[in-house]
């Protein structure tokens, strides 16, 4: 078995950083503990979204469509996250820290795995803002594109709601871009602390996508959760081999697409494609930003945009 153990009698145990991200994403989404059933079972969920409604009009003409908030029913599959840890009696006797470290990492690994699923749902956002530069304006536009009631007049209320997941490299860029605005703020001068930008709380997430920032409120994603973690153990007495399993049933889902926006570093340009490229994402103008759309035939003549 491929464990690396200490052969010394006197042990010093140093555990490397096991977390993909130190952020517990369950605090950033709604948690519904009513999940029942087993892995593979289906659950239907209402997903709210917004349609685009911006048109170019001639004089005297009116809009032929309106921006609408609607929901569609999507079918999700209940997920089972499980891991396994095996060790021999002789390994535990040689290195007493083997089992505690192994069992601790089982919990860490489940944490990382569920976190990854939650973040994946946030990344399904179909609202976007193009930002040539990460600055105050980019986050202000993101908040303006979300379907929340508080904007200009109650910024302190927005700051209790909105958050952003930012890659460390993008946080560094944001610090540089805000340096002039924050040069008289003591905490920024001493530590580079940014905190809140345009009512959005900034959270560094080391495995977030570089160049794409997720801005959202908790209502965007729901974690349907079956409470508790199941633990099962088994032992082969003849071989002195021990096995521990830990498992969790859960289901993360984007339940309100109007409450999450992607800030994409880059410029929005009108598409020059004359045919649809399946590998590309096309956008329509939506408020101060854009919304993912699907061209019928010709992205260029249908006024679709690309961001990058």
PLM features: what roles do these ranges have?
Residues 53-56, 173-176, 253-255:
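Short helix/loop capping segments that flank catalytic or ligand/cofactor-binding pockets
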Residues 124-195:
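Extended, solvent-exposed, turn-rich assembly/linker loops in the middle of proteins
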Residues 191-236:
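Glycine/small-residue-rich hydrophobic helix-like segments
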Residues 233-272:
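Extended, compositionally biased alpha-helical segments that mediate assembly or anchoring
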Residues 1-71, 238:
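N-terminal "assembly arms/tails" that initiate or stabilize quaternary assembly
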Residues 116, 120, 132-148, 159, ...:
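Cell-envelope/extracellular anchoring and linker segments
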Residues 45, 68-127, 164, 236-248, ...:
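Long, contiguous amphipathic alpha-helices that act as assembly "spine/axial" helices in icosahedral shell
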Residues 1-23, 270-274, 278-280, 286-288, ...:
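Short, intrinsically disordered N-terminal pre-domain segments
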């Amino acid at each position: 078995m491929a464990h690396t153990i200490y052969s010394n009698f006197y042990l010093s145990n140093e555990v490397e950083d096991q977390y993909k991200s130190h952020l517990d994403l369950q605090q950033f989404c709604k948690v519904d503990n009513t999940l029942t059933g087993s892995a593979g079972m289906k659950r239907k969920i209402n997903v709210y979204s917004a349609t685009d409604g911006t048109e170019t009009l001639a004089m005297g003409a009116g809009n032929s469509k309106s921006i609408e908030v609607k929901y569609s029913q999507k079918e999700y599959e209940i997920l089972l996250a499980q891991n396994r840890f095996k060790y021999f009696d002789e390994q535990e006797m040689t290195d007493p820290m083997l089992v505690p470290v192994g069992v601790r990492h089982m919990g860490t690994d489940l944490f990382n795995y569920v976190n990854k699923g939650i973040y994946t749902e946030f990344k399904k956002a179909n609202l976007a803002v193009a930002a040539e530069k990460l600055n105050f304006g980019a986050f202000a536009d993101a908040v303006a594109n979300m379907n929340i009631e508080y904007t200009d007049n109650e910024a302190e209320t927005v700051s209790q709601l909105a958050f952003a997941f930012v890659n460390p490299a993008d946080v560094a860029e944001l610090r540089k871009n805000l340096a002039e605005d924050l040069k008289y703020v003591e905490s920024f001068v001493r530590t580079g602390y940014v905190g809140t930008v345009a009512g959005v709380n900034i959270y560094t997430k080391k495995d977030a996508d570089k160049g794409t920032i997720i801005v959202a409120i908790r209502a965007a994603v729901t974690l349907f959760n079956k409470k508790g973690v199941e633990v099962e153990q088994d032992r082969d007495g003849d071989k002195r081999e021990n096995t521990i399993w830990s498992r969790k049933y859960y289901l993360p889902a984007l339940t309100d697409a109007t409450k999450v926006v992607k800030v994409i570093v880059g410029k929005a340009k009108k598409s020059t494609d004359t045919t649809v490229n399946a590998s590309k994402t096309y956008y329509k103008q939506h408020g101060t930003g854009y919304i993912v759309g699907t061209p019928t035939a010709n992205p260029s003549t249908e006024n679709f945009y690309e961001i990058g």
